[in-house]
């Protein structure tokens, strides 16, 4: 365990505890220290405080960082469709049916297993979790572009952009029904479903702010081909928002009772493009993943 004590200088008078500690250890994220504080690993004058505690000059802040728990997830030689790669990160085109981080019932065949094999020891280890390199995720049955970070510095840099909603994330999807408006915005908070814990739902009371912009690309007799742009990245955001306006995603059995004429494995949703400031060059870059063949086949059939 790493343990260090710092005396607060005058310039940090009134600073929040979590922000102060994240300044001391810039290689880690602020959320990392918020969890550390919540777990009682940060004290002020030998007393555990909350993350929003305001510091005073000459306060003694003690930080205890537990040793990272060795992951039990094993590398697996799973082919990856790599759209871009350098020393700081890679962008992969995730296939349908692949889980991103390991979870109950999915400890093998995940994206983490694949990138551990591909990158060896070159993956970020933020929070010491069993999800090395993973800075964001997409649902198991959603395909498309996803960033993987190779070191903690790039992880923190990309995570901060995601937190500030400055990452450009555009999706393509096919929904049930004919969407009337050419474009629009859905601004509705999303939280856990009150009854079905597998689902998310519009939750005005306890939900987190969620904003989805949409644009119609093509209309068919019973379906609409659309583009979505996310301002926020809540769990199942596009799926919940579109279902809330009566146009759930084709194949999405969790949020729709609609019958699909196609044999689908989950929702017809693809993370088409991701744009961000590169942590090394500090320049904006944009990576796009081509539509998967099953998606193209449905479009050809509808046309």
Where are these regions (language model features)?
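RNA pseudouridine synthases
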Residues: 1-185, 189, 294-301
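Short, surface-exposed secondary-structure edge patches
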Residues: 50-54, 227, 266
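Conserved hydrophobic positions within beta-strands
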Residues: 82, 175, 213-216, 249
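Active-site flanking residues adjacent to catalytic metal/cofactor-binding acidic residues
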Residues: 92, 240, 251
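The conserved catalytic core of RNA pseudouridine synthases
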Residues: 128-160, 168, 172, 187, ...
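Short, surface-exposed loop/helix-turn segments at secondary-structure junctions
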Residues: 201, 250-263
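Active-site-adjacent capping/gating segments
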Residues: 263-271
